[in-house]
């Protein structure tokens, strides 16, 4: 039972860590949506945005994960960098909590993200008419809602809604459920992905996920991004958490 539980945590968090990266919104949709009469004005503006991915960035990511039923929790602060050559690299600078999650989940997940950059897989999950159908949705938090329905079952696609700024159609949030369960053991994964304009580029700033696992119950995951540079422009000075002050700093299995 113990080895199975560890395997469930590992499989879940690797999936959650990879999912935010490939849920990058809208970058490839301009040509598809620019003059399509199927889409209302605001959605058409979003699909028509000429919004290429940033050519380079450096960010401090803060990762936290827990499962109360299995009494496991961990955290990690990681410097991540993406350069103009398309290379992704990372450096762990602070960590605490379950040594298993830190060594076998977080670090392996970073390697998974590195492989995703190299493989070009994000195109499978872009917010384009090829991947999704779109319909008018309910407003929330002063944002205009659009219902997004995947055109196929895929763990990289979200069945839910996107929320856009009403004045310009810029993407602020994606939320919903992964359209395909990552495995038999992971019954469902609900995810919220948040974006913000930084140095003119739309950048991910947070991802939160909750998963229901057979025999293990509810597991939670949160990752935030604090940027130091975007496209060569300095935008912040993030600092890692201190292991002496962090409540999860105590090493455990």
Predicted regions and their residues:
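Bacterial N-terminal signal peptides that target proteins for export
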Residues: 2-15
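C-terminal segment of classical bacterial N-terminal signal peptides
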Residues: 19-27
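Beta-strand-dense domains in secreted/periplasmic systems and polymorphic toxin scaffolds
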Residues: 174, 205-209
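C-terminal soluble interaction/assembly domains
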Residues: 191-193, 207
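Structured extracytoplasmic
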Residues: 29-159, 166-170, 180-189, 201, ...
